[in-house]
């Protein structure tokens, strides 16, 4: 049966756009911004450490930043109610216009 792989997105900044093909072997190349010279690559989470080490060794890579998608609260239902109760507990008064 098919098992879902845990994946993570990496934003890889390059010195030159011509080096984008070299990085396509590390994972799934999702987006390439030629103007800003960065790539978005998705890789498996269990391979993250080894692939980051290999990518950082390349001379064409300026910087690598992992995605913060896992850190974001994606529970949108009830956010307004939760914020409203927190503001009332702190004594927050909305501005009067």
UniProtKB/Swiss-Prot annotation:
Under InterPro entries, the record lists: DUF2129
Signal peptide from the UniProt entry:
none
Pfam families tied to this protein:
DUF2129
Annotated Gene Ontology cellular components are:
cytoplasm
Q: Which residues form a coiled coil?
A: none
Q: Where in the cell is the protein located?
A: Cytoplasm
Quick check: keyword Cell membrane in the entry?
no
* Entry annotated with the keyword Cytoplasm: yes
Annotated keywords: Cytoplasm
Q: Which domain of life is it from?
A: Bacteria
Q: What is its main location?
A: cytoplasm
Q: Which family does it belong to?
A: Belongs to the UPF0298 family.
Name by which UniProt lists this protein: UPF0298 protein MGAS10750_Spy0325
At the highest ranks, the source species' classification is: Bacteria, Bacillati, Bacillota, Bacilli, Lactobacillales
